[in-house]
From Swiss-Prot:
GO terms for molecular function: GTP binding; GTPase activity; guanosine tetraphosphate binding; translation elongation factor activity. Residues 19-26 are annotated as: G1. It comes from Rhodopseudomonas palustris (strain HaA2). GTP hydrolase that promotes the GTP-dependent binding of aminoacyl-tRNA to the A-site of ribosomes during protein biosynthesis. Its EC number is 3.6.5.3. Residues 136-139 are annotated as: G4. Residues 81-84 are annotated as: G3. Gene3D superfamilies: P-loop containing nucleotide triphosphate hydrolases, Translation factors. This is Elongation factor Tu.
Length: 396
């Protein structure tokens, strides 16, 4: 079946829902599509559909972040809904990395919870530029003073992680009320107010479209009769159908050709920075590509294993380590979409690193990763984030 061409008329923005498990992230995502569907800006997507991430299910491989698209009068949005459980933190990291802005969902009945804090920290870590808060389940709280208290708590928490807590819009409402049409003000109207805040407060991202093409590989599919499709979000630049590209990282660099680009099941003649695309690769086998590699313009990025980094090690209270670590510490380094084991070498005169420290360190990875200065990473142990860092300089 021929696919419809994807029209680019409005500016595009990637956002997503973050927050504690069961605070209503997926319900809110469904509610946004329901309310915007009234004006033709979306197709209503029910909770259980989002929960199942339908577009990936069709290919027999599931991606744990669900994508929906919708538009307001000002913008076109691609919205990711990240699962809330702590063991999905890996996807939270890739999900949050896919955001020009985030909607932090906090239950008014519970207030901020451990994952609220963790997701704000992760948003800060992966460089989400702006957050808007939806105080959900307000229909369950009768006391206006209690609502104010929760709002204050949320603002304090945001400020603690270097978001402008005093300025961030906080919209009070109920996703369920919007889905069930039970309370116009807390439901329908609050959702419209939220979208207004998202339009106004989340800055239109400047797309690094003029830089050389780079796309981190998130998933790889084999589509019968068409070949291998690699999905991910284009980090920068443009890939045109027919262009030669390189697959860099983890293994030896390979050359291939992009023979097709699709977005939301529609064909494009090119994919550009900010787009979530599937890229069809000529002559590349499913097993030749894996999550953690990047597709890029030939020669633009090299794989490296040794670099100097500036890192922040989380405190115990932030969910980090309880004990110090020493030279030859071997955690995982989470680059873009994957964990790679590496060995830490501390600078002369630094005996050990305590939770809460900032540290300049040298890292030797066991496999090469496509990297450049300013690339961010998380430091993890057994699936738990224990630090955040940035590549300061490359050694080799």
């Amino acid at each position: 079946m021929a696919k419809a061409k994807f029209e680019r008329t409005k500016p595009h923005c990637n956002i997503g829902t973050i927050g504690h498990v069961d605070h209503g992230k997926t319900s809110l995502t469904a509610a946004i599509t329901k309310v915007l569907a009234e004006t033709g800006g979306a197709t209503f997507t029910a909770y259980d559909q989002i929960d199942k991430a339908p577009e990936e299910k069709a290919r027999g491989i599931t991606i744990s972040t669900a994508h929906v698209e919708y538009e307001t009068t000002n913008r076109h949005y691609a919205h990711v809904d990240c699962p809330g459980h702590a063991d999905y933190v890996k996807n939270m990291i890739t999900g949050a990395a896919q955001m020009d802005g985030g909607i932090l969902v906090v239950s008014a009945a519970d207030g901020p919870m451990p994952q609220t804090r963790e997701h704000i920290l992760l948003a800060r870590q992966v460089g989400v530029p702006a957050l808007v808060v939806f105080l959900n389940k307000c229909d369950m709280v009768d006391d206006p003073e209690l609502l104010e208290l929760v709002e204050m708590e949320v603002r304090e928490l945001l400020s603690k992680y270097d978001f402008p807590g005093d300025d961030i819009p906080i919209i009070k409402g109920s996703a369920l009320a919007a889905l069930e049409n039970s309370d116009q003000k807390l439901g329908h109207d609050a959702i419209l107010e939220l979208m207004k805040a998202v339009d106004a407060y989340i800055p239109q991202p400047e797309r690094p479209i003029d830089q050389p093409f780079l796309m981190p590989v998130e998933d790889v599919f084999s589509i019968s009769g068409r070949g291998t499709v690699v999905t991910g979000r284009v980090e920068r630049g443009i890939v045109k159908v027919g262009e030669e590209i390189e697959i860099v990282g983890i293994r030896d660099t390979q050359k291939t050709t992009c023979t097709g680009v699709e977005m939301f099941r529609k064909l494009l003649d090119q994919g550009q920075a900010g787009d979530n695309i599937g890229c069809l690769l000529r002559g590349t086998k499913r097993e030749d590509v894996e999550r953690g590699q990047v597709l890029c313009k030939p020669g633009s990025v090299k794989p490296h294993t040794k670099f100097k980094a500036e890192a922040y090690i989380l405190t115990k209270e932030e969910g980090g380590r309880h004990t110090p670590f020493f030279t030859n510490y071997r955690p995982q380094f989470y680059f873009r979409t994957t964990d790679v084991t590496g060995v830490v070498h501390l600078p002369e005169g630094t005996e050990m690193v305590m939770p809460g420290d900032n540290i300049a360190m040298e890292v030797h990875l066991i496999v090469p990763i496509a990297m450049e200065e300013k690339l961010r990473f998380a430091i993890r142990e057994g699936g738990r984030t224990v630090g955040a860092g940035v590549v300061a300089s490359i050694i080799e």
